[in-house]
């Protein structure tokens, strides 16, 4: 089985590789640099989902893969949170028939100073968080979640949960009409 990932970010590519390998066995994963078609910092579930779907569709279109996978992180409004926003990773999986399945991982809140920079300066959360901890490559490694959870959960693992949730309908095709 061949799986194209609409990203070259190691935290995304390895997450896809590990989940697909665990479910399907022998898997070839091909990272493809694509344009998400949404702002670098998506805001709202609609924008975030659109980015994940765009990445998945472009990945499968540019290859002969069986599946295209897109992962997009974005902020969305949540009442009663400290900042008013939470971050979530959405995953889209597209097959050769054009069927899309979606999933997302756990949501979490960025520190208020990071959210303020996003909305006042237009800085992407990953960049703002990387600057906060003096690690410009943070989002390609343990991610903000790795820093915020003191290493208990890293970005790859967060992405793996989103990928697994997107595969739920494919693991149970008879219940989802696939």
From Swiss-Prot:
Comment on bound cofactor: Binds 1 divalent metal cation per subunit; can use either Mg(2+) or Mn(2+).
Swiss-Prot/TrEMBL keywords: Hydrolase, Magnesium, Manganese, Metal-binding, Nucleotide metabolism, Nucleotide-binding
Swiss-Prot/TrEMBL GO biological process terms: nucleotide metabolic process; thiamine metabolic process
Cofactor(s) of this protein: Mg(2+); Mn(2+)
Class of the enzyme per the UniProt entry, highest EC level: hydrolase
GO molecular function terms listed in the Swiss-Prot or TrEMBL record: ITPase activity; metal ion binding; nucleotide binding; ribonucleoside triphosphate phosphatase activity
Entry binding sites for substrate: 7-12, 64-65
Enzyme Commission no: 3.6.1.73
Chain positions recorded as Mg(2+) binding sites: 35, 64
Reaction(s) catalysed (UniProt annotation): XTP + H2O = XDP + phosphate + H(+); ITP + H2O = IDP + phosphate + H(+)
Pfam families recorded: NTPase_I-T
Subunit field text: Homodimer.
Known function: Phosphatase that hydrolyzes non-canonical purine nucleotides such as XTP and ITP to their respective diphosphate derivatives. Probably excludes non-canonical purines from DNA/RNA precursor pool, thus preventing their incorporation into DNA/RNA and avoiding chromosomal lesions.
Stated name of the protein: Probable inosine/xanthosine triphosphatase
């Amino acid at each position: 089985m061949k799986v194209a990932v609409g990203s070259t970010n190691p935290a995304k590519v390895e997450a896809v590789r590990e989940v697909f390998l665990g479910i399907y066995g022998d898997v070839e994963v091909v990272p493809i640099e694509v344009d998400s078609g949404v702002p670098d910092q998506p805001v709202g579930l609609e924008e975030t989902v659109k980015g994940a779907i765009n990445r998945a569709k472009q990945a499968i279109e540019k290859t002969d893969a069986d599946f295209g996978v897109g992962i997009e992180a974005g902020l969305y409004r949540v009442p009663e949170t400290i900042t008013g926003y939470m971050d979530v990773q959405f995953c889209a999986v597209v097959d050769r028939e054009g069927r899309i399945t979606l999933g997302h991982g756990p949501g979490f809140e960025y520190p208020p100073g990071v959210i303020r920079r996003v909305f006042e300066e237009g800085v992407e959360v990953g960049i703002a968080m990387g600057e906060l901890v003096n690690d410009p490559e943070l989002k390609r490694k343990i991610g903000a979640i790795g820093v915020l959870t003191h290493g208990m959960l890293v970005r790859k693992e967060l992405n793996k949960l989103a990928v697994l949730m997107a595969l739920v309908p494919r693991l149970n095709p008879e219940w989802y009409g696939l």
